[in-house]
């Protein structure tokens, strides 16, 4: 099965995610998303960036956070997800050595 990556120009990305170009510039500056390609005059974004921005927009509407707050919240949420995954793997390793009654 082939991997397919969808890419968006700035205009397409803004239309797809519902944000303005100014907001896109701000969230790129904050590191919320990064362009997958930087061409001479424009950025190109992949489908993963669109998912992250849609998640950020949802946080903005539901929690009334500003973009810097959203950047922090997304970072913390990603850290939590990684820690949960690491915890799950460590528990699996530990269960091999601990006798269950």
UniProtKB/Swiss-Prot annotation:
Its biological purpose: Interacts with CbpA and inhibits both the DnaJ-like co-chaperone activity and the DNA binding activity of CbpA. Together with CbpA, modulates the activity of the DnaK chaperone system. Does not inhibit the co-chaperone activity of DnaJ.
Family: Belongs to the CbpM family.
Protein name: Chaperone modulatory protein CbpM
Organism: Escherichia coli O1:K1 / APEC
Gene: cbpM
